[in-house]
Amino acid sequence: GPGFGERAKTNGYTWTTYPERLEKNGVSWKLYQGGSGEPGSPTDNYTDNSLEFFSQYQVGEGASPNSPLVTKGVTDHTLAEFREDVANNRLPEVSWIVAPYQYCEHPEASPRDGAWYINQILESLVANPEVWSKTVFILNYDENDGLFDHVVPPMPPLTQQTNAQGLVSPDLLAALDDEFIDMDQYPYERRPLVPGSDPGGKQPIGLGARVPLLLISPWSTGGWVCSQTFDHTSVLQFLEARFDIREPNINQWRRSICGDLTAAFDFAGTPNPAIEKIPVPAVLASLHQPYSVPDVQSMPQQEPGTRPARALPYSLTTSSRIEPATGRFWIDFENSGKAGAAFYARNGILPQEPPRRYSVSAANTLSDCWLLSGSGPDRKHASRPRFDPDYDISIHGPNGFFSHFRGAIPAPGQPHPEVTVHYNHATGDVQLTLANTGNAPCAVKVVNAYAKSEVGHQLQLEAHATLEDHWNLGASSGWFDLSVTVTDAPAFLRRFAGHVETGRASTSDPGVFSEEV
C-alpha cells in the first residue's frame, strides 16, 4: 500500500486479501457480480470489485484463469446464480455482492433502482428459511454523497506532544505508521477543491466522513441502533470473530477505535427469522413528474421518538485542573470501558485553531494542557471584564459524549470549584463530585437539560469542602446533560453530556429531536 488508484488488469497491488485467507483456511466464499442476470440488464460492476486491482486475481499478471481467486473473485456470478445457490443450499459461508452502476445509488443512479436490487437479494435469502435463519446481510456504502458531516472523524495526530495536535495512548503508538501517508510521494493525489489548500507532506488518514451501514439478520430485527464507532475494517473484524481467521493488515489503532460489529447483534437471545409483511404503498400521483422546489424551504427535521439501542462498551469521563503557577489548564481523559475511544477538542478562545485529536485505548488515561489566556500581566488589570474566560475547551467523543470546560483563573481569596463525574453502571445513574479548594464559599447550580421541568440543584459549596450531587436518569434512559455554574463567577461552566452504560439495552438519545437539548 497505500492503494490510491484502480489498477484493473495490470500492475495490481500485491498484499494478501481476505478471500485468500478464507481460501487457505477452507472457508467457502464467492463474489457475486455481473448484474441481476436478467436479459438486457447491465452487467458492469462500476469498478467496485476491489479484488480486480490485485495482481493475484489478474490473468494478465500471471494468475491462472482456473484458480479459485479468479473463478470466485473476478468472474461474473449474477443475482440469478445467487438465487439458485440460496435455493439449493449452496450459498458460501462468505459472500460479497457488487452491484452494477445502475443499482449502486451513486449519483446519477437512482436510489429507487438501488432499493430494487437490495430487495432482490433479500427476497432470495428469505425464500429459503433454512439459509435465512443463519445469515447476516451487511449493506455497505462507501461514500457519503457529498453531504456535510458536522462530526470530525477519528484521526490520530501527527505529533505526540502536550499542548500541540493531540495525543494517542502509548500502547497504540506502534500502529500509527500505517495511519500516515507522505503526500509529497503522491503528487497526483493532491487535488484539493480549494487550490493550494492541500498541505502535502506527512498526513494522517483517519476514518473519513460517516456513511450508512445496515445489518439485516434474525439477530438484529426490531429497528435497533448501535452507536459504537465502526469503519470498513469492522466488516473484516466481524469475519474474524466468526471464523477465527485474523487479518494482520488491520492495525491496533483501528482495532481499538473501531468495533467488530458484534455489539449490534443479540446473539445471546432467540433469533427471529420471521419476515414482516409490508403492504405495497399506493402509487404517488407525482410519479415521473418534475420535482417542484417549494418557495419557502426549511431544514429537514429529525424523526421524532427514540429507537431501541444496543449496549455499548464505553465508559468515558473527562475532568480538569488548573495550574496557575505554570499558566496551564489540564484535561484528563479516562477510559474505563472495554473499547478504545476517539475524542476531539476545540478551543473556544482560539476558534481558528484546528481541533486536537485524542485516541484513548481501553482501561487507559491521557492528559493534555492548554496555555491559560489570562496567565500573563493582563490578569492584573482591574478593568478586566468579569465574564472573560482564561480557558474554553469543548470535548466531543462517541455516542453523544460531550464535555465543556470554561472559566477564569481563581484569584487569591476566591472560591476554586471543580467538578468530576462518576457513573453507576449498575443503576444507570450519574453522580457529580463538587470540590472547592479555594478560600471562600460559592453558590453552585446544577441543571440537567433532559429535565426541563426541574429547577435544578442549588448547592452551597463551602471553602475546602466537597459535595456529592446525585442524578437519577431513569426518565431519560441513562442520558444526561448536566451544566454546573457558579453565581459569582459568570465565566465558570462545567458541562457533561452522554449516556451511562449498564450492559443492558437502552434507547437512542431522546434529546436529539428536542430543540432544547
Q: What kind of region is each of these model predictions?
A:
Residues G1-V517:
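N-terminal pro-sequences and low-complexity stem/linker regions of secreted or lumenal proteins
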